[in-house]
UniProtKB/Swiss-Prot annotation:
Gene Ontology terms: biological process: translation
Subunit structure, as described in the record: Part of the 50S ribosomal subunit.
Family per record: Belongs to the universal ribosomal protein uL22 family.
GO cellular component terms listed in the entry, alphabetical order: cytosolic large ribosomal subunit
NCBIfam families referenced in this protein's UniProt entry, alphabetically: rplV_bact
PROSITE patterns: RIBOSOMAL_L22
Gene3D superfamilies tied to this protein: Ribosomal protein L22/L17 (3.90.470.10)
Stated role: This protein binds specifically to 23S rRNA; its binding is stimulated by other ribosomal proteins, e.g. L4, L17, and L20. It is important during the early stages of 50S assembly. It makes multiple contacts with different domains of the 23S rRNA in the assembled 50S subunit and ribosome. The globular domain of the protein is located near the polypeptide exit tunnel on the outside of the subunit, while an extended beta-hairpin is found that lines the wall of the exit tunnel in the center of the 70S ribosome.
The keyword Ribosomal protein is annotated on this UniProt entry: yes
Gene for this chain: rplV
Protein name, entry field: Large ribosomal subunit protein uL22
GO molecular function: rRNA binding; structural constituent of ribosome
Keyword Ribosomal protein among record annotations: yes
Assigned keywords, A-Z: Ribonucleoprotein, Ribosomal protein, RNA-binding, rRNA-binding
């Protein structure tokens, strides 16, 4: 008996957005139908929205192309943001000093799964 795949995943690594800011947006789509999730992301005025929308669309495309899943029955099963490598920079300050600036990056993961009707 072959196990049937009912979920697909997409990951964007080392995206130049702070994980804390991306998590605010990713919390909005977790558990939603994919059509509703795309609509939410399209009208959310946050810098993370287009990035997460792109990852979600990639997961949907993976589900359709790789596993022949029905797009109309897909739900965002998992959506999370992990911290990527931090780029460390310095900003010159007064009197010869310098302040550290941490440019944080994120790893964004979205898993969509097919919900069986009935």
């Amino acid at each position: 008996m072959a196990s049937e795949v009912t979920s697909a995943k997409a990951v964007a690594k080392t995206v130049r957005i702070a994980p804390r800011k991306a998590r605010i947006v990713i919390d909005l789509i977790r558990g939603k139908q994919v059509g509703e999730a795309i609509a939410i992301l399209k009208y959310t005025p946050r810098s993370a929205s287009p990035i997460i929308e792109k990852v979600l669309k990639s997961a949907i495309a993976n589900a359709e192309h790789n596993y022949d899943l029905d797009i109309n029955n897909l739900v965002v099963e998992e959506a999370f943001v992990d911290e990527g490598p931090t780029l460390k920079r310095f900003r010159p300050r007064a009197q010869g000093r310098a302040s550290a600036i941490n440019k944080r990056t994120s790893h964004i993961t979205v898993v969509v799964s097919e919900v069986k009707e009935g």
